[in-house]
Amino acid sequence: MTTIKTSNLGFPRLGRTREWKKAIESYWAKKISKEELDQTLTDLHKENLLLQKYYHLDSIPVGDFSLYDHILDTSLLFNIIPERFQGRTIDDDLLFDIARGNKDHVASALIKWFNTNYHYIVPEWDNVEPKVSRNVLLDRFKYAQSLNVNAHPVIVGPITFVKLSKGGHQTFEEKVKTLLPLYKEVFESLIDAGAEYIQVDEPILVTDDSESYENITREAYDYFEKAGVAKKLVIQTYFERAHLKFLSSLPVGGLGLDFVHDNGYNLKQIEAGDFDKSKTLYAGIIDGRNVWASDIEAKKVLIDKLLAHTNELVIQPSSSLLHVPVSLDDETLDTSVGEGLSFATEKLDELDALRRLLNQNDSVKYDKLKARYERFQNQSFKNLDYDFESVRTSRQSPFAQRIEQQQKRLNLPDLPTTTIGSFPQSREVRKYRADWKNKRITDEAYETFLKNEIARWIKIQEDIGLDVLVHGEFERNDMVEFFGEKLQGFLVTKFGWVQSYGSRAVKPPIIYGDVKWTAPLTVDETVYAQSLTDKPVKGMLTGPVTILNWSFERVDLPRKVVQDQIALAINEEVLALEAAGIKVIQVDEPALREGLPLRSEYHEQYLKDAVLSFKLATSSVRDETQIHTHMCYSQFGQIIHAIHDLDADVISIETSRSHGDLIKDFEDINYDLGIGLGVYDIHSPRIPTKEEITTAINRSLQQIDRSLFWVNPDCGLKTRKEEEVKDALTVLVNAVKAKRQE
């Protein structure tokens, strides 16, 4: 009988109570020393390693832990340093500056990691001299060994790393070949240090165009075979199905496949005999991206099927557990829903239950998890009926007619200025909200504070000279969690944090039941803000696609049904804002692109559903009401027509870190709706110059009709300091005023 082994691809960095985030931000704020930061993070890394050891994993990942981002770690490992940051010592301070920018230089681009809500720092190849320069991976592997942890190093593979990079004069293939000797050097150092195998993450090999670079992939791994290291390599793929016959032909020791998000294709390939039995199969059977407990009995059935076609089997999560919270231990959840949940720690417990059952015939833990899952499944969370057909899915009039009525009503100047929505969440704001939630202050005291903060920022915006204002969202902890707290069908946790980018953590709500709007969500704050000014104040909402993509979704209904339920709820709030006299309503969809399936065969339906849901949420308003939306930067070329089909009167897009790349996406489309391309990077504390903003405006106007163009920051300003926001917006408005005189 084959012995089943267990492993993991990666563990959350944040810590149970976001210790990682707090330590790093304290260091940035100069509240703790570098030595204190190092000690805190070392302690957290140790805790993560020993926790995984407690659940009897046969091999534990090292290299998943990072001070910011594992792709940026790889860039520094190979001396792929942006040209503007070259010449400095390669250390943690350089890492932070590349990621965040500084007073002299802009940060590197920040892009979604495949179709997740994690973001990576894009490697830049302009004028670089690749070499092994900072082997932190080796240091962390040796540290794990010192703890008597059976660890395996983790590194993003050469094909994926280069494919996610930008810049440089070399071709894709030339860049890969440049890195191969460096990867070999790193692999040899790890093997010499005692690594039994090395996890090489190549998720790019599950994407549509992977077949177009199969030749360079084969050349790369043949190179490693000739170097004598290939048999120690395990290629891990995740998020979709892989081309198994090709992967099996590579001279590596093992292959990792996703058996959760592959739509059943990977098992079909296994059963068709496409897997080379001389290799070890690393089977991703536990969902690494959602928080629902596994159907443990179904997982056992899957394992039995895989055992019939493999000689060595390791079971693992479908992807790194970076995408889920750390533990349920500190949560106080209603049992009816709580029994159906599984965070990172509980997923390790599921693996351990299967290992015990299959290797030791010990069914105690397995039976407990099976009974718990069955109790959850026996409940019904499908209780509501919906009338989707009675709600409009297109505006009353075309944009050309609407914009005339809107401009007459709003009377906006040339190149109107606005912000994306949120203003700084100061320590005082967070304290008041926490005190209110914990009932340490009265509703009246909290409402008074919010009104004072709204009034203060309305005046700040008027003094700066912005044209369309916002109330600042001080009552909101997160643009999705806020709606999760107020809409029926959502569950919000206390400690369910996950990393989005750098030290930015979000707490996705959990959709467990039918979604319904029961009362106004944002009307009071928005109407109050509008009462303080003659300038228009935007109502600020999050769109249905983003709410779904940034939540942990229920799995007992099709995505489209849940998405449309959310759209109906948002439509109710849009109409409530309009009825209250709000003239401009923004429905943000920053996550529309990130949810795009990795395989193009699913793109058309996804985009069709997304557009319909957005229009379901926004089309019932009158022509004179202006609908805005906002999206975060990504590769928009694939969805540019869908963006147009949303029929939003104005869209603002995060673009500054793309350094002009995004504008190319508008060359092939006559974009005839209002648009604002973000003119400065809000993810960096750096204040833009007037010249930089003017350059960004001029570059945008080469492709976009001036009468349709808006000027705005990249994104919401929640994470910035007040003085940074004031200074940056003042520069923005002054640049626009000068441009209006030309």
Curated annotation (Swiss-Prot):
- First-tier enzyme category under EC: transferase
Q: What is its EC number?
A: 2.1.1.14
Signal peptide (residue range): none
Q: Name one GO molecular function term.
A: 5-methyltetrahydropteroyltriglutamate-homocysteine S-methyltransferase activity
Gene Ontology terms describing biological process: methionine biosynthetic process; methylation
User: What positions does the entry give for L-methionine binding?
Assistant: I420, G421, S422, E473, D588
The protein, known as: 5-methyltetrahydropteroyltriglutamate--homocysteine methyltransferase
Lineage, top ranks: Bacteria, Bacillati, Bacillota, Bacilli, Bacillales
